[in-house]
């Protein structure tokens, strides 16, 4: 049940973070930064919950769990410090890296959730 809730939180927070980030990036929602950061933290927290939770299932993967932890740390770190990284003409590179990490966060979380559901399907 916890993985199912975390998966729903990941979907909702991840999608809203993606939309608010693109709005912020395009200059539309400059006041959405705090909301975007909160949604990103929720998405990463859900990723970590799913990653660690699926690792303890019968056919869980500790590689997925470790990848979830590393990806979450990278996503948060790049998000928090991106305004001071590659300042100038190449700043778009950091923005694309952060966007890519966010999309990977959603994808890896759902991959872990599906793995968990498949491993526990017979025990219901």
Name the predicted role of every residue range.
Residues 1-124:
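Polytopic transmembrane helical bundles with strong interfacial aromatic enrichment
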